Amino acid sequence: MMLNKLTEIVMKKYLFFLILFLNFVSSYAQVKDTLKLIFIGDIMQHGPQITSAWNGESYDYSDNFQYLLPLFNYADFVIGNLETTFNGPPYTGYPAFSAPDDFAKALKDASIDILVTANNHSFDKGVSGVVRTIKVLDSLYINHTGTFKNYEDFQKNHPLIIQKGSIRLALLNYTYGTNVGISKSSVLINIIDTNEIRDDILLAKSYNPDGIIIFFHWGEEYHRLPNTSQIEIANFCIRNGANYLIGSHPHVIQPMHKNILDSSNNVESVVYYSLGNFISNQRGINTDGGAIAYLEFTKNQNKLHINRAGYLLSWTWKKFVNNKYIYINVPSWEFNKIDSNSADQNAMKTFLDSSRNLLNKYNVGINEYYFDKNQNKLFPIDTKSYEYK
């Protein structure tokens, strides 16, 4: 009798520890997958930028992104709007852009992984410009969507699938139109049309993604608030199943919203109406910098959540060195790289102040971050104690 009682106690303890062990193994097996995405705005090549890059032998853009490389390496994917073509020489800036191939290589070297190519400058150099741009990107293994050299290319890259581990997202890209008329050819470009977008969202869903991203080229240039059309298109897309909307074209930053859309299914959505200029020669107030969107996803038990939705600010420094200008994208946390109290530093301060005043007033659920390269982490800007936030 005593032996049976002892055996029963031992078995209960064994079962207790076995259950604990199995729970541990189960929770370990369900380690959350994460995905970190960065989005950047208008990547431009005005004439002075092209002239600046020439070193007598080639076009050197190595200065452009030096301060952002640690942040971009931190992300799993960096996605930007390519607002130039690679049509070969002669190289031209505004109004019909064609940049050196070296600039494409500089984007690749800066850890920019994906470029959306549907914008009003896509056809600046006609059909040949579209085709050659895609060939240059393909040669550098830079993924792309928005314009397509033929139907086969369209089928391959529309939607563009972004995947890390078990997390899978579908990316679509559209523009309101092009500056140069689109001639009939095998080349394709995605134009904003709600009927087409609805169909494309259904197509994207057939790939069983965890979420759908749409990168739009829309809105009014130099307007700091979204217009009615942007808001209506955003609401339409979200109602039809898109989750994360990114905007470009206005060349200035516009507000950002994170929403819980529908209490019945608790869908999360984010809209960044415009990220402004990532790099350009535009020097007017609010056009000399931009926002960097940051989305961090966690997937647990087959459900994707936005762990963090934020933004970071950066400014294009047109620095005079050795009798010429060079262009450097300076993020807010590298403010002190610019000479103290100089006209350049004051210009960056003006940009940061103006951007924060706008976004602090109109943003919903999306706050500013900075990147600490020593800790390789993002932190809320309010925790940063540098000379100028």
Question: What are the functions of these language-model segments?
Answer:
Residues 30-389:
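Acidic, metal/ion-coordinating pockets
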Residues 2-14:
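Positively charged n-region of N-terminal signal peptides that target proteins for export
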Residues 14-23:
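Sec-dependent N-terminal signal peptides
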Residues 25-29:
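Sec/Tat signal peptide C-region and signal peptidase I cleavage site
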